[in-house]
Amino acid sequence: MDPEVSKLLATVTSLGETVKKHASTDKESPASRESRRELLSAARQLTNELQNEGQIVEGYLYGTIDPLLLKMGIDLGIFRKLVDSSTPVTLGELMSVSGADEVLLARIMRGLSSIHAVREVGVELYEPNKVTRAFTTVKGQSGLDVFHNINHPGWQSLPECLRATGYRNPTDPAKMWFGRQFNGEPYFDWLGKRPELLSSFHRFMSTQRDGHAHWLDFYPFQQQLLPDFDAGDPDAVFMVDVGGSVGHEIQEVKRRYPGIPGRMVLQDVPATIARVDPENGMEAMAHDFFTPNPIKGARAYYLRNVLHDWDDDRCCVILKHIRDAMTPGYSVLLINEFSIPRKGACSFATHSDFMLMAINAAVERTEQQWYHLMKSVGLQIKKIWTLEPDTESLLEVTRVD
């Protein structure tokens, strides 16, 4: 046996025992998650070592078909039928649900079975597995809708777009797939005109962290922000979520800290604010973050996955408006995004980086890039809080005066 394979097998076996030990006691602890990450990494390396070069190439070439099969599984109601059934489901039963032709449906089911998205328990007889269930969740269904309609076409065009610009780091959205496809129309303007896709986008954003740690898991929220807050002032604003979609972050703060004092303000574009539930205990405000922020002197301003949608010049505009609203020595800006290390970046962060590049000429930033960007607008990073490589960091930022 190849020495590398033997080494990886031993690593997988050892890590497997560690994961089993954690599973019985502290499944969601940092140590447990780290063991599982290491096991997944070793298992993927082992898969590569067990394949010959031709098989490795085939895996990458044909792997792009997998999301298309999953999309069919959702669109035809296959996954939902399997998950809802207490017994194995026949091809005939799936035909009744999907309305698909028997020959085509059999081909789709063979494809789904071959990528282990369903469990084939007999001839034309199927059961759900973990993958099946994953794509009946809000994250699985809304995410695949967004990725199929926007992200995947953008990725396909990326090599051509980069070649056309002489392989210069892209900063102009008009030169990337989305801008070329839709005559330079800004991405979020285009999305706002498509209610069904916009709904999928917001539902995906609300579940994007499923399977990952939340920033409130590792940032000492109360200890960092409550001591200096004037809870006796009924008009005092505790937190402003800038560009916060429909308010899932404020809702999570309120869920974890139900007694938190002060006003909680959600800001986003009018089309998004119109979707906010008025009973959720936050103030919803239509606001364009490229204009001055009307909420002055809040204890905390929060940005999650906003700056990664824009190049440095546009980010400077957003940040300067927030800086001008901050009270020196009191207000804090919390930026919740990836801070990619220069060595050992995880694939989740790098995949997101290329997704943003392809769609909007945007970027997931490195730690050095964050420091440079903040300094350029009169802000200072007090600390970067990071739990795990595949979890977005929390940058704690103050105003420099």
From Swiss-Prot:
<dbReference type="GO" id="GO:0032259">
    <property type="term" value="P:methylation"/>
</dbReference>
<dbReference type="InterPro" id="IPR029063">
    <property type="entry name" value="SAM-dependent_MTases_sf"/>
</dbReference>
<dbReference type="InterPro" id="IPR036388">
    <property type="entry name" value="WH-like_DNA-bd_sf"/>
</dbReference>
<dbReference type="GO" id="GO:0046983">
    <property type="term" value="F:protein dimerization activity"/>
</dbReference>
<dbReference type="Pfam" id="PF08100">
    <property type="entry name" value="Dimerisation"/>
</dbReference>
<dbReference type="GO" id="GO:0008171">
    <property type="term" value="F:O-methyltransferase activity"/>
</dbReference>
<dbReference type="InterPro" id="IPR016461">
    <property type="entry name" value="COMT-like"/>
</dbReference>
<comment type="similarity">
    <text>Belongs to the class I-like SAM-binding methyltransferase superfamily. Cation-independent O-methyltransferase family.</text>
</comment>
<feature type="active site" description="Proton acceptor">
    <location>
        <position position="308"/>
    </location>
</feature>
<dbReference type="GO" id="GO:0044550">
    <property type="term" value="P:secondary metabolite biosynthetic process"/>
</dbReference>
<dbReference type="InterPro" id="IPR036390">
    <property type="entry name" value="WH_DNA-bd_sf"/>
</dbReference>
<dbReference type="Pfam" id="PF00891">
    <property type="entry name" value="Methyltransf_2"/>
</dbReference>
<dbReference type="GO" id="GO:0009813">
    <property type="term" value="P:flavonoid biosynthetic process"/>
</dbReference>
<protein>
    <recommendedName>
        <fullName>Methyltransferase cfoC</fullName>
        <ecNumber>2.1.1.-</ecNumber>
    </recommendedName>
</protein>
<keyword id="KW-0949">S-adenosyl-L-methionine</keyword>
<keyword id="KW-0284">Flavonoid biosynthesis</keyword>
<dbReference type="InterPro" id="IPR012967">
    <property type="entry name" value="Plant_O-MeTrfase_dimerisation"/>
</dbReference>
<comment type="pathway">
    <text>Secondary metabolite biosynthesis; flavonoid biosynthesis.</text>
</comment>
<dbReference type="InterPro" id="IPR001077">
    <property type="entry name" value="O_MeTrfase_dom"/>
</dbReference>
<feature type="binding site">
    <location>
        <position position="268"/>
    </location>
    <ligand>
        <name>S-adenosyl-L-methionine</name>
    </ligand>
</feature>
<keyword id="KW-0808">Transferase</keyword>
<comment type="function">
    <text>Methyltransferase; part of the gene cluster that mediates the biosynthesis of chlorflavonin, a fungal flavonoid with acetolactate synthase inhibitory activity. Within the pathway, cfoC is responsible for the methylation at position C8-OH of flavonoid. The pathway begins with the PKS-NRPS hybrid synthetase cfoA that uses benzoic acid or p-hydroxybenzoic acid as a starter unit with four rounds of chain elongation using malonyl-CoA to form the chalcone skeleton.</text>
</comment>
<keyword id="KW-0489">Methyltransferase</keyword>
